[in-house]
């Protein structure tokens, strides 16, 4: 039995991973005859041995055909191409299917996870964080799911960065289907698709906790953008803590269900971050970072000669959507006058018009010189 076939059969045993899989693969490769009795000598149960032997020949042949295609790889844990960051975890996958560039797996990665039903706030700040980090050389790793995962991947690609997607199913299909084009773009820009599951395995619910440990295991840290208290993103954060990774949490508006997860993590000791540089400072990895150009900064420069337009009005526009009539009522000004001032604030980059009203974009560094509440 050739080595590749041994790994394919072992990968079909869902309860097998890590050192045990590597040890068994090496042992089986030395045997001249394989049956259930022989396999049980390695420590496999009878059921696991039967699973190994019954893995369909058709699946093996289709997997071998898949591996013949360009940039399609099967990476055992004893391979020089296996990511060392993941290998250092206690429950690392015994082997990985990878489509794309193998060197991406060895890059400096930050996992970015969050809610599938994200808010406007989560999308905006998740995108800004990922764009900035990607331009600074960080590979953005996530799960290709709807919501924040997709936002993270797209943001990295938008600035010509590199992104890695770890799937909870086999690489023969992309889930969700709406992200097929996103997956293709990710590969075109030097990223990779990764899975520990046989190629034809569907996206079953119990696959995703296993997927989450790979997302965190590949990365130096995990950024949670938005998440409910009962969320797979918190599973990823827990995996990160167990693996000795840093966990970063982006705070959100009080009352937003998506803020509950990050706020809970912060209470448990996660690092609260309000700008990407705070992540870079916590994850120093030897690169010579280029300073941000002033025009790319999220916040206004703290200079006395920069005038803050209409501070009384700006104080009444928050991070959540605020209708125009509410702003006018709070400011005690006529609606037509408020509309004119809001337009000027929008042109200056302080707020943005969204369906239903306006939202704040930048923190006023002039808060010490005005009564603007930030």
UniProtKB/Swiss-Prot annotation:
InterPro entries: DprA, DprA_WH, WH-like_DNA-bd_sf. One of its GO terms (biological process) is DNA-mediated transformation. It holds the Pfam family DprA_WH. Disruption phenotype: No visible effect on transformation or growth in the presence or absence of mitomycin C (in strain KA797), on plasmid conjugation (in strain PC4020), on nucleotide excision repair, survival of UV damage or DNA recombination. Belongs to the DprA/Smf family. NCBIfam families: dprA (TIGR00732), PRK10736.1 (NF008007). Partially complements natural chromosomal DNA transformation defect of an H.influenzae dprA disruption mutant. May help load RecA onto ssDNA. This is Protein Smf. It comes from Escherichia coli (strain K12). The gene is smf.
């Amino acid at each position: 039995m050739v080595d590749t076939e041994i790994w394919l059969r072992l990968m079909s045993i869902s309860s097998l991973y890590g050192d045990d899989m590597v040890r068994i693969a090496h042992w089986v490769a030395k045997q001249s005859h394989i049956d259930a009795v022989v396999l049980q000598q390695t420590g496999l149960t009878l059921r696991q041995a039967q699973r190994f032997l019954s893995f369909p020949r058709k699946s093996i042949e289709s997997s071998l055909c898949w591996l013949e295609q360009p940039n399609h790889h099967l990476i055992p844990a004893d391979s020089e191409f296996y990511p060392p960051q993941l290998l250092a975890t206690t429950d690392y996958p015994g082997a990985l299917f990878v489509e794309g560039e193998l060197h991406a797996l060895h890059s400096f990665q930050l996992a970015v996870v969050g809610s599938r039903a994200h808010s406007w706030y989560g999308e905006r700040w998740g995108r800004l964080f990922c764009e900035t980090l990607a331009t600074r050389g960080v590979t953005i790793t996530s799960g290709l799911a709807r919501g924040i995962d997709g936002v993270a991947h797209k943001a990295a690609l938008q600035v010509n960065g590199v992104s890695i997607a770890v799937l909870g199913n086999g690489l023969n299909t992309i889930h969700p289907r709406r992200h097929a084009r996103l997956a293709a773009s990710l590969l075109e820009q030097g990223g990779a698709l990764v899975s520990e599951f046989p190629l034809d395995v569907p996206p079953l619910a119990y696959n995703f906790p296993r997927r989450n440990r790979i997302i965190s295991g590949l990365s130096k840290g995990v950024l949670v953008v938005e998440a409910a208290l009962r969320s797979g993103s918190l599973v990823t954060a827990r995996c990160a803590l167990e693996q000795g990774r840093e966990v970063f949490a982006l705070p959100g508006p009080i009352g937003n269900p998506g803020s509950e997860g990050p706020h809970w993590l912060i209470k448990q000791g996660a690092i609260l971050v309000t700008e990407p540089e705070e992540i870079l400072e916590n994850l120093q990895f030897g690169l010579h970072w280029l300073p941000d150009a002033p025009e790319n900064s999220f916040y206004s420069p703290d200079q006395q000669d920069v005038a803050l337009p209409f501070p009384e009005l700006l104080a009444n526009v928050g991070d959540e959507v605020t209708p125009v009539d509410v702003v006018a009522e709070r400011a005690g000004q006529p609606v037509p006058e408020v509309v004119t001032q809001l337009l000027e604030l929008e042109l200056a980059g302080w707020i943005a018009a969204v369906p239903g009203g306006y939202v704040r974009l930048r923190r006023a560094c002039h808060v010490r010189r005005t009564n603007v509440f930030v």
